[in-house]
Amino acid sequence: MQNDAGEFVDLYCPRKCSASNRLIHAKDHASVQLVIADVDPATGRAADSSKMYVVCGAIRRMGESDDCIVRLTKKDGILVKNY
């Protein structure tokens, strides 16, 4: 689809679940998106970079969202390995 300026734009850009790689459809109102900012240890201020985690409603419905977030943050080095 094109806008008035002639640029190609998408109406809907689907997201994927970070834990299961499922596509999150538009009507999945139980899904959550968490953005964790990187913090400078010297100043305590948020840096320009961040890490985003998306959990679909099916994972949340099973009660596995907290385990998935812990597993993903350990893999990315945000949490320590022996948490």
From Swiss-Prot:
GO (cellular component) term, any one: rough endoplasmic reticulum
Keywords: Cytoplasm, Endoplasmic reticulum, Ribonucleoprotein, Ribosomal protein
Designated gene of the protein: RpS21
GO biological process: translation
Domain of life: Eukaryota
Similarity remark: Belongs to the eukaryotic ribosomal protein eS21 family.
Subunit architecture: Component of the 40S small ribosomal subunit.
Species the sequence originates in: Plutella xylostella (Diamondback moth)
Cystine bridges: none
Subcellular location: Cytoplasm, Cytosol; Cytoplasm; Rough endoplasmic reticulum
Main location per the UniProt record: cytoplasm
Entry-linked PANTHER family: 40S RIBOSOMAL PROTEIN S21
One Pfam family per UniProt: Ribosomal_S21e
Matching InterPro entries: Ribosomal_eS21, Ribosomal_eS21_CS, Ribosomal_eS21_sf
GO MF terms, alphabetically ordered: structural constituent of ribosome
Protein name: Small ribosomal subunit protein eS21
